[in-house]
Amino acid sequence: MIAKKIISPFAKTDLSDASKWYEKQQKDLGKRFLNEMKEAFEIICQTPTSFPIRYDDYRIYYTKTFPYSIHYQYIDYKNEIQIKAVFHTARNPQIWEQRIF
């Protein structure tokens, strides 16, 4: 069964900021970024336990084209994923960790 997806306000801001930045770099690149994120969310929802646990019970999924990682929790008894961050892989991980710890 496909898991329900909840995107945190922080992750929504991450998505918005990144797509705007990519759109400024090249026309339609922001849209391509958002499309890849949508595909990634679908994959995570279909197979939420397939990706490694990185911190405590937070899992991480690395996108294919863009250098981003999606940090999420899978709540098994609710069959729900909670997306906490959409994070550029070159950024300091302590920034997103401060959101959850």
Q: What residue spans do the PLM features occupy?
A:
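Enriched for short, Lys/Arg-rich terminal
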Residues: Q73-F101
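Arg/Lys-rich, positively charged N-terminal/basic patches that mediate binding to nucleic acids
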Residues: M1-L34
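Short, hydrophobic secondary-structure boundary micro-motifs
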Residues: K31, P52-R54, I95
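Generic recognition of well-ordered alpha-helical segments
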Residues: T13, D17, E39-E42, Q46
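Basic/aromatic recognition patch in beta-strand/loop cores that engages polyanionic ligands
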Residues: E39, Q46-E80
